[in-house]
């Protein structure tokens, strides 16, 4: 996949933060150490973020998969993400995939990734994430309003999600909260998942003509 550069005249400091975040996200993350140290509490999971071509959103986008290490071809979560410059923050629109199983493995096989088109996705309303840079890391959380609704265990819940990312790590905590009682229904009760980057796909992120990397 050959990324297209953004014109230098359009590059701002907030654009650079957006590109840095995209590059840090682009990779194969594994919580192998956490799962090995605490096998009763944590399964071994991979989180993949693979850059999409610039033309997909006329901007920066990523495809993601979350899979158990023992079953890499059957992701339990897939998505497409569009990064949007909000000045001092970065807004990530989240999209679901229609017939998602057809694209399983796209994070590892570029031939599958190329079959994903804008017609394949639909916006997950209320489920966007908002990130802000904090020195050597970005911190993000789901947009306010408790509108990212997910039905599980016969209960209507909203997503409570927080993420911290550095160049080499991804720490996330996703919990489903009852819309009426605000009590946790699903998600980790042992604390956040802690991932380390095993492989980077940062070279596939569209480049900036005057990019200073960090």
Identify the residue ranges that each predicted region occupies:
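A generic structural signal for short beta-strands and their flanking turns/coil linkers
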Residues: 43-45, 58-60, 77-79, 88
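Calycin-type beta-barrel ligand-binding domains and close structural analogs
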Residues: 10, 15-20, 24-28, 32-34, ...
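Short, solvent-exposed loop/hinge segments that bridge or flank secondary-structure elements
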Residues: 18-23, 27-57
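N-terminal acidic, proline/glycine-rich, low-complexity intrinsically disordered segments
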Residues: 1-5
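N-terminal glycine/threonine-rich, aromatic-flanked beta-hairpin/loop signature
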Residues: 47-69, 73-74
């Amino acid at each position: 996949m050959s990324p297209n550069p953004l014109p230098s005249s359009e590059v701002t400091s907030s654009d650079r933060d957006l590109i840095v975040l995209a590059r840090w996200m682009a990779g194969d993350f594994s919580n192998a150490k956490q799962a090995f140290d605490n096998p009763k509490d944590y399964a071994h999971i991979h989180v993949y973020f693979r850059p999409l071509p610039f033309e997909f959103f006329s901007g920066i986008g990523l495809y993601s998969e979350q899979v158990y290490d023992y079953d890499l071809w059957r992701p339990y979560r897939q998505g497409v993400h569009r990064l949007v410059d909000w000045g001092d923050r970065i807004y990530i629109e989240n999209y679901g995939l229609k017939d998602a199983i057809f694209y399983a493995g796209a994070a590892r096989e570029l031939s599958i990734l190329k079959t994903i088109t804008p017609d394949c996705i639909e916006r997950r309303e209320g489920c966007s994430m908002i990130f802000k840079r904090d020195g050597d890391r970005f911190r993000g959380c789901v947009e306010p309003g408790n509108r990212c609704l997910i039905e599980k265990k016969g209960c209507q819940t909203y997503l409570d999600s927080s993420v911290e990312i550095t160049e080499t790590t991804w720490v996330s905590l996703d919990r489903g909260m009852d819309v009426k009682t605000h009590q946790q229904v699903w998600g980790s009760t042992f604390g956040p998942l802690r991932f380390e980057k095993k492989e980077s796909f940062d070279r596939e992120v569209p480049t900036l003509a005057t990019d200073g990397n960090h």
